[in-house]
């Protein structure tokens, strides 16, 4: 009888042990978008970005991807105007890492092969000198109409420089700290109607 009880106890112990189960592994991330809404159909010049920028580091090229940033331009015509000029100038372009490292990235902006810089204006349209704006040409044709004219075009955005701590420049982006950088890239547009 003792042997039977012992055998049943052993079977129960081995059955209770079972095979080790692998635990499920899950991960979760949250993406957050800043959101605002604005409508302006009365200003002489309205420029609206059509999307946002998201740069991703690519290990294979040890760099960040470039982005095409589209924008919409609307102008109010001036029937007394004989010429029209539209220029752009870079205002802000620094992204800062969201930790305590102080690491920064600078974003370069290019319009049809010309750098948009903080130190001077980039001419996009200048009807007096035959610069008709490529994709923005509807503005060059409608600046002296009695209604509003719109056109769309885009900038090319690239990461042009970075620092590990806000001061120490990097030449190899693979040496940047891991993390997320955030900030604004702002471009000022100036329109001039000449009468």
Swiss-Prot record:
Residues 1-22 form the signal peptide. The keyword DNA-binding does not apply. It is found in: Fimbrium. The keyword Signal applies. Transmembrane segments: none annotated. InterPro entries: EcpA, Fimbrillin_EcpA_sf. Its main location: other. Coiled coil: none annotated. One of its GO terms (cellular component) is pilus. It holds the Pfam family MatB. Keywords: Fimbrium, Signal. Gene3D superfamilies: Fimbrial protein EcpA. Induction: Negatively regulated by H-NS. Positively regulated by IHF and EcpR. Self-associates. Forms filaments. Interacts with EcpD. Part of the ecpRABCDE operon, which encodes the E.coli common pilus (ECP). ECP is found in both commensal and pathogenic strains and plays a dual role in early-stage biofilm development and host cell recognition. Major subunit of the fimbria. Belongs to the EcpA/MatB fimbrillin family. This is Common pilus major fimbrillin subunit EcpA. The gene is ecpA.
